[in-house]
Protein backbone atom coordinates (compact mmCIF):
# COMPACT_ATOMS: atom_id res chain seq x y z
CA UNK A 1 0.00 0.00 0.00
CA UNK A 2 1.30 3.50 -0.75
CA UNK A 3 2.51 5.92 1.88
CA UNK A 4 0.37 8.76 0.56
CA UNK A 5 -2.88 6.92 -0.08
CA UNK A 6 -5.85 9.16 0.60
CA UNK A 7 -8.96 7.91 2.41
CA UNK A 8 -11.91 6.79 0.37
CA UNK A 9 -14.84 9.19 0.48
CA UNK A 10 -17.80 7.92 2.50
CA UNK A 11 -20.60 6.30 0.55
CA UNK A 12 -24.13 7.50 1.07
CA UNK A 13 -26.65 4.97 2.18
CA UNK A 14 -28.98 3.86 -0.53
CA UNK A 15 -26.57 4.63 -3.38
CA UNK A 16 -23.92 2.06 -2.56
CA UNK A 17 -24.42 -0.34 -5.47
CA UNK A 18 -24.67 2.45 -8.07
CA UNK A 19 -21.51 4.18 -6.87
CA UNK A 20 -19.56 0.94 -6.70
CA UNK A 21 -20.64 -0.09 -10.16
CA UNK A 22 -20.06 3.22 -11.90
CA UNK A 23 -16.24 3.23 -11.68
CA UNK A 24 -16.15 -0.19 -13.31
CA UNK A 25 -18.59 0.99 -15.97
CA UNK A 26 -16.35 3.98 -16.68
CA UNK A 27 -13.28 1.75 -16.80
CA UNK A 28 -15.05 -0.59 -19.20
CA UNK A 29 -15.99 2.27 -21.52
CA UNK A 30 -12.43 3.60 -21.47
CA UNK A 31 -11.11 0.15 -22.34
CA UNK A 32 -13.72 -0.53 -25.03
CA UNK A 33 -13.31 2.71 -26.97
CA UNK A 34 -10.48 1.37 -29.15
CA UNK A 35 -12.53 -1.58 -30.37
CA UNK A 36 -15.54 0.69 -30.91
CA UNK A 37 -13.45 3.09 -33.00
CA UNK A 38 -12.10 0.24 -35.11
CA UNK A 39 -15.53 -1.30 -35.67
CA UNK A 40 -17.06 2.04 -36.65
CA UNK A 41 -14.30 3.32 -38.94
CA UNK A 42 -12.42 0.24 -40.18
CA UNK A 43 -9.29 2.40 -40.35
CA UNK A 44 -5.92 0.76 -41.00
CA UNK A 45 -2.98 2.80 -42.20
CA UNK A 46 0.79 2.80 -42.57
CA UNK A 47 2.37 -0.40 -41.29
CA UNK A 48 -0.86 -1.77 -39.81
CA UNK A 49 -1.95 -3.85 -42.86
CA UNK A 50 1.64 -5.04 -43.23
CA UNK A 51 1.72 -6.20 -39.62
CA UNK A 52 -1.42 -8.28 -40.07
CA UNK A 53 -0.13 -9.62 -43.38
CA UNK A 54 3.00 -10.87 -41.61
CA UNK A 55 0.75 -12.65 -39.15
CA UNK A 56 -1.27 -14.35 -41.88
CA UNK A 57 1.93 -15.24 -43.69
CA UNK A 58 3.24 -16.85 -40.49
CA UNK A 59 0.12 -19.01 -40.44
CA UNK A 60 0.29 -19.91 -44.14
CA UNK A 61 4.06 -20.44 -44.24
CA UNK A 62 5.56 -20.93 -40.75
CA UNK A 63 9.06 -20.94 -42.28
CA UNK A 64 8.61 -17.20 -42.75
CA UNK A 65 9.35 -16.75 -39.05
CA UNK A 66 12.59 -18.67 -39.55
CA UNK A 67 13.88 -16.33 -42.23
CA UNK A 68 12.12 -17.40 -45.42
CA UNK A 69 11.51 -14.48 -47.80
CA UNK A 70 8.03 -13.17 -48.49
CA UNK A 71 7.77 -13.79 -52.23
CA UNK A 72 4.31 -12.23 -52.35
CA UNK A 73 5.56 -8.66 -52.05
CA UNK A 74 7.73 -6.50 -54.26
CA UNK A 75 6.59 -3.18 -52.83
CA UNK A 76 9.80 -1.47 -53.97
CA UNK A 77 9.20 -2.67 -57.52
CA UNK A 78 10.76 -5.06 -60.00
CA UNK A 79 14.04 -4.30 -61.83
CA UNK A 80 13.24 -1.74 -64.55
CA UNK A 81 14.66 -1.67 -68.05
CA UNK A 82 16.73 0.44 -68.20
CA UNK A 83 17.72 0.49 -64.55
CA UNK A 84 17.98 4.28 -64.59
CA UNK A 85 14.17 4.41 -64.44
CA UNK A 86 14.46 3.50 -60.76
CA UNK A 87 17.23 5.92 -59.75
CA UNK A 88 17.17 5.19 -56.02
CA UNK A 89 17.72 1.48 -56.62
CA UNK A 90 15.32 0.40 -53.88
CA UNK A 91 14.10 -2.40 -56.15
CA UNK A 92 17.48 -4.11 -55.67
CA UNK A 93 16.35 -5.21 -52.22
CA UNK A 94 14.26 -7.99 -53.74
CA UNK A 95 11.68 -9.77 -51.64
CA UNK A 96 11.13 -8.74 -48.04
CA UNK A 97 11.13 -10.61 -44.76
CA UNK A 98 10.25 -10.14 -41.11
CA UNK A 99 11.82 -6.97 -39.74
CA UNK A 100 15.05 -7.64 -37.80
CA UNK A 101 13.75 -5.71 -34.78
CA UNK A 102 10.68 -7.93 -34.50
CA UNK A 103 10.19 -10.93 -32.28
CA UNK A 104 7.85 -13.83 -33.05
CA UNK A 105 5.13 -13.02 -30.52
CA UNK A 106 3.03 -10.52 -32.49
CA UNK A 107 3.01 -12.47 -35.79
CA UNK A 108 2.05 -15.60 -33.86
CA UNK A 109 -0.84 -13.79 -32.17
CA UNK A 110 -2.19 -12.59 -35.52
CA UNK A 111 -1.58 -16.05 -37.00
CA UNK A 112 -3.48 -17.73 -34.17
CA UNK A 113 -6.49 -15.44 -34.44
CA UNK A 114 -6.61 -15.89 -38.21
CA UNK A 115 -6.10 -19.64 -38.00
CA UNK A 116 -8.97 -20.07 -35.55
CA UNK A 117 -11.48 -17.54 -36.91
CA UNK A 118 -10.61 -16.66 -40.54
CA UNK A 119 -12.19 -13.30 -39.66
CA UNK A 120 -10.67 -9.99 -40.72
CA UNK A 121 -12.92 -8.23 -38.21
CA UNK A 122 -11.54 -10.21 -35.29
CA UNK A 123 -8.02 -9.90 -36.67
CA UNK A 124 -8.37 -6.13 -36.66
CA UNK A 125 -9.62 -6.21 -33.07
CA UNK A 126 -6.45 -7.82 -31.68
CA UNK A 127 -4.66 -4.54 -30.98
CA UNK A 128 -7.79 -2.67 -29.77
CA UNK A 129 -8.39 -5.47 -27.26
CA UNK A 130 -4.74 -5.24 -26.19
CA UNK A 131 -5.19 -1.49 -25.77
CA UNK A 132 -8.22 -2.00 -23.56
CA UNK A 133 -6.40 -4.60 -21.49
CA UNK A 134 -3.47 -2.21 -21.05
CA UNK A 135 -5.83 0.48 -19.73
CA UNK A 136 -7.25 -2.00 -17.21
CA UNK A 137 -3.79 -3.13 -16.09
CA UNK A 138 -2.75 0.50 -15.68
CA UNK A 139 -5.79 0.98 -13.48
CA UNK A 140 -4.76 -2.05 -11.42
CA UNK A 141 -1.23 -0.73 -10.89
CA UNK A 142 -2.54 2.67 -9.83
CA UNK A 143 -5.19 1.06 -7.61
CA UNK A 144 -2.50 -0.96 -5.83
CA UNK A 145 -0.25 2.06 -5.35
CA UNK A 146 -2.76 4.91 -4.91
CA UNK A 147 -6.55 4.74 -4.63
CA UNK A 148 -9.55 4.16 -6.85
CA UNK A 149 -10.09 7.79 -7.80
CA UNK A 150 -6.52 8.27 -8.97
CA UNK A 151 -6.52 4.84 -10.58
CA UNK A 152 -9.48 5.89 -12.73
CA UNK A 153 -7.66 9.11 -13.54
CA UNK A 154 -4.63 7.11 -14.70
CA UNK A 155 -6.83 4.90 -16.87
CA UNK A 156 -8.62 7.90 -18.38
CA UNK A 157 -5.35 9.74 -19.02
CA UNK A 158 -3.86 6.74 -20.82
CA UNK A 159 -6.92 5.84 -22.87
CA UNK A 160 -7.46 9.42 -24.05
CA UNK A 161 -3.79 10.27 -24.63
CA UNK A 162 -3.89 11.01 -28.40
CA UNK A 163 -0.89 8.90 -29.34
CA UNK A 164 -2.09 5.88 -27.36
CA UNK A 165 -5.69 6.22 -28.51
CA UNK A 166 -4.74 6.38 -32.18
CA UNK A 167 -2.30 3.49 -32.27
CA UNK A 168 -4.45 1.29 -30.03
CA UNK A 169 -7.30 1.51 -32.55
CA UNK A 170 -5.27 0.13 -35.47
CA UNK A 171 -2.94 -2.83 -35.87
CA UNK A 172 0.36 -1.33 -34.79
CA UNK A 173 2.37 -3.50 -32.42
CA UNK A 174 3.50 -1.02 -29.77
CA UNK A 175 0.25 -1.42 -27.86
CA UNK A 176 0.80 -5.17 -27.63
CA UNK A 177 4.29 -4.49 -26.27
CA UNK A 178 2.71 -2.09 -23.76
CA UNK A 179 0.31 -4.82 -22.68
CA UNK A 180 3.06 -7.35 -21.97
CA UNK A 181 5.37 -5.00 -20.10
CA UNK A 182 2.51 -3.54 -18.04
CA UNK A 183 1.37 -7.04 -17.10
CA UNK A 184 4.95 -8.06 -16.25
CA UNK A 185 5.58 -5.05 -14.02
CA UNK A 186 2.21 -5.38 -12.29
CA UNK A 187 3.15 -8.96 -11.42
CA UNK A 188 6.63 -7.79 -10.39
CA UNK A 189 5.18 -5.23 -7.99
CA UNK A 190 2.90 -7.89 -6.54
CA UNK A 191 5.77 -10.35 -6.10
CA UNK A 192 4.43 -12.88 -8.62
CA UNK A 193 7.73 -14.20 -9.94
CA UNK A 194 6.46 -16.84 -12.37
CA UNK A 195 3.96 -14.49 -14.02
CA UNK A 196 6.58 -11.74 -14.19
CA UNK A 197 8.89 -14.10 -16.07
CA UNK A 198 6.07 -15.17 -18.40
CA UNK A 199 4.92 -11.69 -19.36
CA UNK A 200 8.47 -10.34 -19.35
CA UNK A 201 9.42 -13.00 -21.88
CA UNK A 202 6.47 -12.03 -24.09
CA UNK A 203 7.62 -8.41 -23.91
CA UNK A 204 11.21 -9.28 -24.81
CA UNK A 205 10.04 -11.39 -27.75
CA UNK A 206 7.74 -8.69 -29.12
CA UNK A 207 10.34 -6.17 -30.26
CA UNK A 208 14.00 -5.66 -29.48
CA UNK A 209 13.42 -2.29 -27.79
CA UNK A 210 11.24 -4.05 -25.24
CA UNK A 211 14.13 -6.28 -24.26
CA UNK A 212 16.13 -3.15 -23.39
CA UNK A 213 13.21 -1.53 -21.58
CA UNK A 214 12.24 -4.56 -19.51
CA UNK A 215 15.75 -5.55 -18.49
CA UNK A 216 16.67 -1.93 -17.73
CA UNK A 217 13.70 -1.51 -15.39
CA UNK A 218 14.44 -4.74 -13.52
CA UNK A 219 18.16 -3.91 -13.17
CA UNK A 220 17.31 -0.44 -11.86
CA UNK A 221 14.90 -1.80 -9.26
CA UNK A 222 17.30 -4.55 -8.19
CA UNK A 223 20.16 -2.09 -7.72
CA UNK A 224 17.90 0.25 -5.79
CA UNK A 225 16.77 -2.56 -3.52
CA UNK A 226 20.28 -3.90 -2.93
CA UNK A 227 22.09 -0.58 -2.49
CA UNK A 228 19.51 0.79 -0.08
CA UNK A 229 19.48 -2.50 1.85
CA UNK A 230 15.71 -2.46 1.88
CA UNK A 231 15.41 -6.16 1.15
CA UNK A 232 11.88 -5.80 -0.13
CA UNK A 233 12.50 -8.71 -2.48
CA UNK A 234 15.07 -11.51 -2.30
CA UNK A 235 17.99 -11.01 -4.65
CA UNK A 236 17.18 -14.38 -6.21
CA UNK A 237 13.80 -13.01 -7.30
CA UNK A 238 15.40 -10.03 -9.04
CA UNK A 239 17.85 -12.34 -10.79
CA UNK A 240 15.13 -14.78 -11.85
CA UNK A 241 12.83 -12.18 -13.41
CA UNK A 242 15.81 -10.66 -15.23
CA UNK A 243 17.73 -13.73 -16.39
CA UNK A 244 14.99 -16.16 -17.43
CA UNK A 245 13.30 -13.88 -20.01
CA UNK A 246 16.71 -13.03 -21.47
CA UNK A 247 17.69 -16.69 -21.68
CA UNK A 248 14.41 -17.61 -23.35
CA UNK A 249 14.70 -14.73 -25.82
CA UNK A 250 18.41 -15.31 -26.56
CA UNK A 251 17.98 -18.03 -29.25
CA UNK A 252 15.62 -15.83 -31.23
CA UNK A 253 17.91 -12.81 -30.96
CA UNK A 254 20.86 -14.88 -32.11
CA UNK A 255 19.09 -16.62 -34.98
CA UNK A 256 16.87 -13.82 -36.28
CA UNK A 257 19.10 -10.79 -35.73
CA UNK A 258 22.76 -11.53 -35.05
CA UNK A 259 23.40 -14.71 -37.06
CA UNK A 260 21.33 -13.32 -39.94
CA UNK A 261 23.79 -10.44 -40.23
CA UNK A 262 21.39 -7.66 -39.30
CA UNK A 263 22.94 -4.58 -37.76
CA UNK A 264 22.10 -3.37 -34.29
CA UNK A 265 19.29 -0.85 -34.00
CA UNK A 266 21.75 1.84 -32.88
CA UNK A 267 24.21 1.33 -35.74
CA UNK A 268 24.55 4.31 -38.03
CA UNK A 269 22.68 6.76 -35.79
CA UNK A 270 22.81 10.32 -37.08
CA UNK A 271 22.85 13.60 -35.17
CA UNK A 272 21.53 15.44 -38.22
CA UNK A 273 18.62 13.02 -38.52
CA UNK A 274 17.95 13.42 -34.79
CA UNK A 275 17.75 17.22 -35.08
CA UNK A 276 15.43 16.86 -38.06
CA UNK A 277 13.06 14.24 -36.62
CA UNK A 278 12.82 15.15 -32.94
CA UNK A 279 10.70 18.31 -33.42
CA UNK A 280 8.33 16.35 -35.66
CA UNK A 281 8.05 13.57 -33.08
CA UNK A 282 7.23 16.08 -30.34
CA UNK A 283 4.47 17.58 -32.48
CA UNK A 284 3.06 14.17 -33.41
CA UNK A 285 2.88 13.12 -29.76
CA UNK A 286 -0.13 15.45 -29.40
CA UNK A 287 -0.82 16.27 -33.09
CA UNK A 288 -0.23 19.93 -32.28
CA UNK A 289 2.34 22.60 -33.21
CA UNK A 290 5.60 22.25 -31.34
CA UNK A 291 4.95 25.12 -28.90
CA UNK A 292 1.60 23.64 -27.87
CA UNK A 293 3.14 20.17 -27.63
CA UNK A 294 5.97 21.48 -25.44
CA UNK A 295 3.51 23.37 -23.25
CA UNK A 296 1.52 20.17 -22.83
CA UNK A 297 4.62 18.19 -21.91
CA UNK A 298 5.55 20.84 -19.32
CA UNK A 299 2.10 20.62 -17.74
CA UNK A 300 2.13 16.82 -17.61
CA UNK A 301 5.72 16.88 -16.37
CA UNK A 302 4.75 19.23 -13.53
CA UNK A 303 2.16 16.73 -12.31
CA UNK A 304 4.66 13.86 -12.59
CA UNK A 305 7.27 15.80 -10.59
CA UNK A 306 4.65 16.66 -7.97
CA UNK A 307 3.80 12.99 -7.62
CA UNK A 308 7.44 12.01 -7.18
CA UNK A 309 8.35 14.87 -4.82
CA UNK A 310 5.18 14.44 -2.81
CA UNK A 311 5.97 10.78 -2.15
CA UNK A 312 2.55 9.67 -3.27
CA UNK A 313 3.96 6.12 -3.40
CA UNK A 314 6.72 4.23 -1.65
CA UNK A 315 10.27 4.44 -3.01
CA UNK A 316 10.45 1.18 -4.97
CA UNK A 317 7.31 1.68 -7.12
CA UNK A 318 8.32 5.28 -7.74
CA UNK A 319 11.75 4.14 -8.88
CA UNK A 320 10.17 1.50 -11.13
CA UNK A 321 7.80 3.99 -12.76
CA UNK A 322 10.57 6.56 -13.16
CA UNK A 323 12.89 4.04 -14.81
CA UNK A 324 10.02 2.91 -17.03
CA UNK A 325 9.42 6.43 -18.33
CA UNK A 326 13.13 7.25 -18.52
CA UNK A 327 13.93 4.21 -20.63
CA UNK A 328 10.94 4.92 -22.86
CA UNK A 329 12.27 8.42 -23.50
CA UNK A 330 15.79 7.10 -24.11
CA UNK A 331 14.56 4.53 -26.63
CA UNK A 332 12.53 7.23 -28.39
CA UNK A 333 15.56 9.52 -28.63
CA UNK A 334 17.68 6.71 -30.08
CA UNK A 335 14.88 5.89 -32.51
CA UNK A 336 14.81 9.52 -33.66
CA UNK A 337 18.47 9.22 -34.68
CA UNK A 338 18.14 5.84 -36.39
CA UNK A 339 18.04 5.74 -40.22
CA UNK A 340 14.76 4.49 -41.76
CA UNK A 341 13.00 4.79 -38.40
CA UNK A 342 10.47 7.46 -39.40
CA UNK A 343 9.08 10.42 -37.49
CA UNK A 344 6.39 8.64 -35.47
CA UNK A 345 6.88 8.80 -31.67
CA UNK A 346 4.90 5.58 -31.20
CA UNK A 347 7.93 3.77 -29.73
CA UNK A 348 7.22 5.56 -26.44
CA UNK A 349 3.76 3.96 -26.19
CA UNK A 350 4.96 1.05 -23.98
CA UNK A 351 6.10 3.64 -21.39
CA UNK A 352 2.84 5.61 -21.33
CA UNK A 353 1.20 3.47 -18.59
CA UNK A 354 3.95 4.61 -16.20
CA UNK A 355 3.40 8.22 -17.23
CA UNK A 356 -0.32 7.83 -16.59
CA UNK A 357 0.20 6.47 -13.06
CA UNK A 358 2.70 9.18 -12.07
CA UNK A 359 0.47 11.87 -13.58
CA UNK A 360 -2.46 10.60 -11.53
CA UNK A 361 -0.26 10.47 -8.43
CA UNK A 362 0.77 14.10 -8.79
CA UNK A 363 -2.20 15.95 -10.24
CA UNK A 364 -4.01 16.30 -6.91
CA UNK A 365 -0.80 17.50 -5.24
CA UNK A 366 -0.64 20.56 -7.47
CA UNK A 367 -2.09 23.86 -6.19
CA UNK A 368 -5.88 23.87 -6.78
CA UNK A 369 -5.82 26.66 -9.35
CA UNK A 370 -2.98 25.02 -11.31
CA UNK A 371 -4.71 21.65 -11.11
CA UNK A 372 -7.96 23.11 -12.42
CA UNK A 373 -6.32 24.91 -15.35
CA UNK A 374 -4.22 21.88 -16.30
CA UNK A 375 -7.21 19.53 -16.10
CA UNK A 376 -9.42 21.74 -18.26
CA UNK A 377 -6.60 22.26 -20.75
CA UNK A 378 -5.81 18.54 -21.13
CA UNK A 379 -9.47 17.55 -21.37
CA UNK A 380 -10.05 20.15 -24.09
CA UNK A 381 -6.86 19.29 -25.98
CA UNK A 382 -7.34 15.52 -25.85
CA UNK A 383 -11.01 15.78 -26.84
CA UNK A 384 -10.44 18.11 -29.79
CA UNK A 385 -7.38 16.24 -31.07
CA UNK A 386 -9.01 12.81 -30.81
CA UNK A 387 -12.18 13.93 -32.58
CA UNK A 388 -10.20 15.54 -35.40
CA UNK A 389 -7.86 12.56 -35.79
CA UNK A 390 -10.71 10.03 -35.83
CA UNK A 391 -12.60 12.06 -38.43
CA UNK A 392 -9.55 12.68 -40.59
CA UNK A 393 -8.38 9.07 -40.55
CA UNK A 394 -11.86 7.76 -41.26
CA UNK A 395 -11.88 9.79 -44.48
CA UNK A 396 -8.20 9.59 -45.39
CA UNK A 397 -7.63 5.89 -44.67
CA UNK A 398 -10.99 4.27 -44.00
CA UNK A 399 -12.72 5.37 -47.20
CA UNK A 400 -10.04 4.03 -49.60
CA UNK A 401 -10.25 0.61 -47.96
CA UNK A 402 -14.03 0.63 -48.19
CA UNK A 403 -13.85 1.87 -51.78
CA UNK A 404 -11.45 -0.91 -52.73
CA UNK A 405 -13.53 -3.71 -51.22
CA UNK A 406 -15.36 -4.59 -54.49
CA UNK A 407 -11.99 -4.86 -56.23
CA UNK A 408 -10.59 -6.90 -53.35
CA UNK A 409 -13.58 -9.24 -53.61
CA UNK A 410 -12.91 -9.70 -57.33
CA UNK A 411 -9.21 -10.35 -56.72
CA UNK A 412 -10.01 -13.02 -54.15
CA UNK A 413 -11.84 -14.92 -56.88
CA UNK A 414 -9.21 -14.61 -59.64
CA UNK A 415 -6.05 -16.49 -60.52
CA UNK A 416 -2.92 -15.68 -58.58
CA UNK A 417 -0.73 -12.91 -59.97
CA UNK A 418 1.05 -9.74 -58.94
CA UNK A 419 -1.14 -6.67 -58.50
CA UNK A 420 0.39 -3.30 -59.33
CA UNK A 421 -1.33 -0.94 -56.91
CA UNK A 422 -0.65 1.92 -54.47
CA UNK A 423 -2.74 -0.06 -51.95
CA UNK A 424 -0.08 -2.75 -51.83
CA UNK A 425 -0.22 -3.81 -48.16
CA UNK A 426 -4.01 -3.66 -48.14
CA UNK A 427 -4.14 -5.80 -51.28
CA UNK A 428 -1.74 -8.33 -49.81
CA UNK A 429 -3.76 -8.53 -46.61
CA UNK A 430 -7.32 -8.59 -47.88
CA UNK A 431 -6.89 -10.60 -51.10
CA UNK A 432 -3.82 -12.81 -50.40
CA UNK A 433 -2.65 -11.88 -53.89
CA UNK A 434 0.99 -10.78 -54.34
CA UNK A 435 1.41 -7.02 -54.77
CA UNK A 436 3.97 -4.56 -56.05
CA UNK A 437 4.48 -0.80 -56.28
CA UNK A 438 7.30 1.78 -56.10
CA UNK A 439 7.43 2.50 -52.36
CA UNK A 440 9.83 5.25 -51.38
CA UNK A 441 10.82 6.11 -54.96
CA UNK A 442 8.50 8.72 -56.52
CA UNK A 443 10.82 9.12 -59.51
CA UNK A 444 10.54 5.40 -60.28
CA UNK A 445 6.76 5.63 -59.94
CA UNK A 446 6.54 8.64 -62.24
CA UNK A 447 8.84 7.12 -64.86
CA UNK A 448 6.63 4.03 -65.12
CA UNK A 449 3.11 5.27 -64.43
CA UNK A 450 3.35 8.43 -66.53
CA UNK A 451 5.12 7.09 -69.61
CA UNK A 452 3.23 4.64 -71.81
CA UNK A 453 6.34 3.11 -73.38
CA UNK A 454 8.04 2.52 -70.04
CA UNK A 455 4.80 1.17 -68.58
CA UNK A 456 4.34 -1.27 -71.45
CA UNK A 457 7.89 -2.62 -71.15
CA UNK A 458 7.62 -2.85 -67.35
CA UNK A 459 4.35 -4.77 -67.46
CA UNK A 460 5.53 -7.16 -70.17
CA UNK A 461 8.90 -7.81 -68.49
CA UNK A 462 7.56 -8.69 -65.05
CA UNK A 463 4.92 -11.06 -63.65
CA UNK A 464 2.28 -8.37 -63.21
CA UNK A 465 -1.20 -9.68 -63.96
CA UNK A 466 -3.43 -6.98 -62.49
CA UNK A 467 -3.40 -3.20 -62.08
CA UNK A 468 -5.57 -1.70 -59.34
CA UNK A 469 -5.73 2.10 -59.33
CA UNK A 470 -8.25 4.83 -58.44
CA UNK A 471 -10.81 5.45 -61.16
CA UNK A 472 -9.93 9.15 -61.21
CA UNK A 473 -6.93 11.22 -60.26
CA UNK A 474 -3.36 11.60 -61.40
CA UNK A 475 -1.91 8.31 -60.18
CA UNK A 476 -1.15 7.63 -63.85
CA UNK A 477 -1.12 9.54 -67.12
CA UNK A 478 -4.04 9.52 -69.60
CA UNK A 479 -1.80 7.70 -72.10
CA UNK A 480 -1.21 4.84 -69.66
CA UNK A 481 -4.94 4.64 -68.92
CA UNK A 482 -5.61 4.51 -72.65
CA UNK A 483 -3.07 1.69 -73.01
CA UNK A 484 -4.78 -0.24 -70.21
CA UNK A 485 -8.17 0.31 -71.84
CA UNK A 486 -6.85 -1.27 -75.06
CA UNK A 487 -4.79 -4.13 -73.61
CA UNK A 488 -6.58 -5.08 -70.39
CA UNK A 489 -10.03 -6.09 -69.28
CA UNK A 490 -11.41 -3.46 -66.93
CA UNK A 491 -13.53 -4.44 -63.94
CA UNK A 492 -15.33 -1.35 -62.67
CA UNK A 493 -15.20 -1.51 -58.88
CA UNK A 494 -16.72 1.80 -57.88
CA UNK A 495 -14.00 4.25 -56.87
CA UNK A 496 -11.32 1.81 -58.03
CA UNK A 497 -10.71 0.18 -61.39
CA UNK A 498 -9.20 -3.29 -61.61
CA UNK A 499 -7.45 -4.08 -64.89
CA UNK A 500 -6.75 -7.69 -65.85
CA UNK A 501 -3.70 -7.63 -68.11
CA UNK A 502 -3.89 -9.59 -71.34
CA UNK A 503 -0.54 -11.23 -72.02
CA UNK A 504 0.49 -13.49 -74.90
Which residues fall in each region the model found?
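Signature aromatic-anchored transmembrane alpha helix within multi-pass, membrane-resident enzymes
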Residues: 10, 23-28, 198, 242-246, ...
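Transmembrane alpha-helix segments characteristic
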Residues: 28-30, 158, 200, 217, ...
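Hydrophobic, aromatic-rich transmembrane alpha-helices
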Residues: 222, 288-322, 328-329
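Short acidic/glycine- and proline-prone juxtamembrane loop motifs at membrane-interface regions
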Residues: 45, 163-174
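Specific aromatic-rich, kink-prone transmembrane helix
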Residues: 137-140, 156-157, 176-195, 199, ...
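Membrane-lumen/periplasm interface segments of specific transmembrane helices
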Residues: 214, 234-299, 327-332
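Membrane-embedded, lumen/periplasm-facing catalytic core of multi-pass transferases
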Residues: 378-428, 438-445, 453, 459
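Transmembrane alpha-helical segments
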Residues: 34-40, 210, 335-338, 362-364, ...
